[in-house]
């Protein structure tokens, strides 16, 4: 199952109601067969601009991120369900890309440039690429336009 991150902006709520909204959100992820990896509260902040959602204008919100794994077919259902929730102002689901694993090449990079494999490849490519000389192909063994 791929990893996803849900960024939520909730309306200003008292703590008990805030907990019930987060619980409701987490249960909907679990009901769809997801696995919650991390829940992070980013705190209450003023929104960058006023946001109108479900007929109410919001200027402040509580921000949360939830890292979870679920099947890609369930993402549309989650977006639709979160869109109907009146306590959620904004919701964004991002697919988390796994970081590319690069092998350690420190022992090769510590070699002098003449011994490095990538430098040798560059030198070999430069030697292969030589400027082509124009061939006249006139059939004559002399150049007739010479003075």
Curated annotation (Swiss-Prot):
Record's keyword annotation contains Endoplasmic reticulum: no
Q: Name one GO cellular component term.
A: mitochondrial small ribosomal subunit
The Swiss-Prot or TrEMBL record annotates one GO molecular function as: small ribosomal subunit rRNA binding
Q: Which GO terms describe its biological process?
A: mitochondrial translation
A family per Pfam:
Ribosomal_S6
The main location is mitochondrion
The record's annotation in CDD domains points to: bS6_mito
Arranged from A to Z, the UniProt key words for this protein are: Mitochondrion, Ribonucleoprotein, Ribosomal protein
Recorded protein name is Small ribosomal subunit protein bS6m
Q: Which gene encodes it?
A: mRpS6
